[in-house]
């Protein structure tokens, strides 16, 4: 099965024509590269659902039952979670970084490489702030190459030093408040999604009397 990441409807349509089995449609909230259109998932997901016929997974800003229910309502078949799974017991990253994700809020990420038209959403730290400042001064990639080196980013996850390098994290950090096991997380999301659909949202379903009328 081939699932292709897309950050725009046009890219999703191209992937569909090329024969992929499904797409991951990534809204602007996502960690890593959100594309250059800056369209949030609330708009991008239904826009893609209106035109794309193959299965679609919603990505970017998802981490709980509310996000899952919203994604289904917007036209996706499910959700993809990146930053949320980083903060789980099974995640191989350092415990200090998991706790940093829990401590961060939705404003914590920085956008780097904006001036280079290769935007990336990363966790805000001393290095990301330095990169942003250099970009404002007209820096080119060569000027920040050492700061954003992959080896430095890997050391963040291995050593647990938040400021050791650049590391990706999405805006969903603002809704992450614990470090559960993957099993606990999935069961919680499914249970709470069912409660939302059959509880709070059930109030919007027509009654038998209304249907008969």
Predicted regions and their residues:
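Short intrinsically disordered, low-complexity coil segments enriched in acidic
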Residues: 1-7, 200
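Hydrophobic faces of well-ordered beta-strands that scaffold small-molecule active sites
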Residues: 2-4, 23-25, 56-59, 79-81
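Glycine/Thr-rich beta-alpha phosphate-binding loop at enzyme active sites
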Residues: 5-45, 88, 92-94
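Conserved active-site-proximal phosphate/metal-binding subdomains
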Residues: 35-41, 45-57, 63-213
């Amino acid at each position: 099965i081939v699932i292709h990441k897309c950050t725009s409807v046009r890219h999703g349509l191209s992937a569909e024509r090329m024969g992929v089995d499904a797409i991951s449609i990534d809204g602007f909230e996502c960690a890593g590269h959100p594309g250059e259109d800056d369209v949030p998932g609330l708009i991008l997901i239904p826009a893609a659902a209106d035109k794309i016929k193959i299965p679609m997974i919603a990505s970017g800003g998802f981490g709980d039952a509310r996000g899952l229910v919203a994604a289904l309502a917007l036209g996706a078949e499910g959700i993809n979670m990146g930053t949320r799974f980083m903060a789980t017991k099974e995640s191989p990253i350092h415990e200090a970084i998991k706790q940093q994700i829990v401590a961060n809020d939705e404003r914590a990420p920085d956008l780097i490489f904006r001036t280079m038209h290769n935007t990336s959403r990363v966790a805000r730290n001393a290095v990301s702030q330095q990169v942003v400042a250099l970009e404002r001064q007209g820096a080119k990639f060569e000027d920040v190459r050492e700061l954003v080196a992959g080896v430095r980013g890997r050391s963040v996850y291995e050593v647990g030093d938040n400021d050791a390098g650049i590391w990706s994290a999405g805006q969903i950090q603002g809704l992450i408040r614990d470090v559960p096991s993957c099993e606990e997380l999935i069961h919680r999301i499914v249970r709470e999604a069912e409660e939302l659909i059959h509880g709070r949202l059930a109030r919007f379903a027509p009654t038998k009397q209304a249907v008969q009328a």
